[in-house]
């Protein structure tokens, strides 16, 4: 019994966790001959606190996102992924990824990094990966960092 994925979504934000998730998603897309959906959500909540909504800051964030997506697209193509789609959207990343982007593009696997929140942050806001796992209608793969491996560094 083998499971084949047709459309794999990975969200990138410049973090190490996202890079690790991207690498795993690219390898899986190549192995499954699947479409790779690279997405970045510009978190509009971070702009809500900026006085008078500074348009230049927003434009810079948008340009940064476009450049980053194109850079990741190049890396994916170098890895041998032939079908890469870029999605730039706006809003709350955890809501947009799980509900809007995944549904709109018929995603059957979301690959996400295990976000590095401390216990207090996790309690207060919950991690993006946790929200996606709870609310996505498709499979979710959470890619752990080396330091988060169960039992890592516990050579007793």
Protein language model regions, located:
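Short, solvent-exposed amphipathic alpha-helices that sit
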Residues: 24, 60-72, 96
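Residue-level marker for beta-strand->alpha-helix junctions and adjacent short loops that shape enzyme
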Residues: 15, 43, 91, 117, ...
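Short, well-ordered secondary-structure micro-motifs
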Residues: 21, 48-51, 96-99, 122-124, ...
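General small-molecule cofactor/ligand-binding pocket signal
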Residues: 39, 85-89, 141
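Gly/Ser-rich helix-loop-strand patches that form or flank binding pockets
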Residues: 4, 27, 103-151
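Structural beta-alpha unit
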Residues: 1-3, 74-110, 147-156
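Small/aliphatic-rich secondary-structure junction motif
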Residues: 2-55, 79
């Amino acid at each position: 019994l083998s499971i084949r994925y047709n459309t794999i979504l990975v969200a990138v934000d410049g973090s190490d966790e996202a890079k690790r998730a991207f690498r795993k998603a690219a390898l899986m897309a190549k192995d499954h001959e699947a479409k790779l959906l690279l997405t970045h959500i510009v978190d509009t909540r971070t702009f809500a606190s900026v006085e008078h909504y500074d348009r230049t800051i927003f434009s810079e964030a948008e340009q940064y996102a476009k450049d980053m997506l194109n850079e990741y697209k190049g890396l994916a193509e170098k890895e041998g992924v032939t079908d890469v789609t870029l999605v730039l959207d706006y809003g709350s990343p955890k809501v947009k990824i799980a509900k809007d982007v995944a549904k709109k593009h018929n995603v059957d696997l979301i690959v996400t990094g295990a976000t590095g929140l401390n216990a207090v942050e996790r309690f207060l806001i919950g991690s993006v990966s946790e929200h996606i796992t709870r609310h996505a209608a498709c499979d979710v793969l959470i890619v752990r960092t080396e330091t988060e491996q169960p039992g890592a560094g516990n050579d007793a």
